[in-house]
């Protein structure tokens, strides 16, 4: 008992879905979405998380240094060759090598 494939150009009968939402859609058609729990229930923040707000009095003196801006680095006093001086040196080397060969 072998089935013959349909002729070329004929769409199968089960190719397109039925009109309307799927049968297993959530929520079922005609019913609203369930109410969400907002605002969060009492007892928030959850156990294990500290409450939000200002730090307690004396917080910086508990062994941690107070944070601030890092110290600025002083500019180097040595004069390093600039890009222009490097390009001139490379051009001179090119001219010398071109004249030699």
From Swiss-Prot:
Entry membrane topology: Single-pass membrane protein
Compartments reported by the entry: Membrane
Chief site of localization: membrane
Keyword Magnesium in record: no
Pfam family, one: CYSTM
Cross-referenced InterPro entries: CYSTM_dom (IPR028144)
Stretches the record annotates as Disordered: 1-80
Family: Belongs to the CYSTM1 family.
Protein name: Cysteine-rich and transmembrane domain-containing protein B
Organism (species): Arabidopsis thaliana (Mouse-ear cress)
């Amino acid at each position: 008992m072998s089935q013959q494939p349909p002729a070329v150009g004929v769409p199968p009968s089960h190719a397109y879905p039925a009109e309307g939402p799927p049968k297993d859609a959530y929520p079922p058609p005609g019913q609203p979405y369930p109410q969400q729990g907002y605002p969060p229930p009492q007892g928030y923040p959850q156990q294990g998380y500290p409450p939000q707000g200002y730090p307690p009095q004396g917080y910086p003196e508990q062994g941690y240094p107070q944070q601030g801006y890092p110290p600025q680095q002083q500019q180097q006093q040595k004069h390093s060759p600039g890009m222009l001086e490097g390009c001139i040196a490379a051009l001179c080397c090119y001219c010398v090598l071109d004249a030699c060969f």
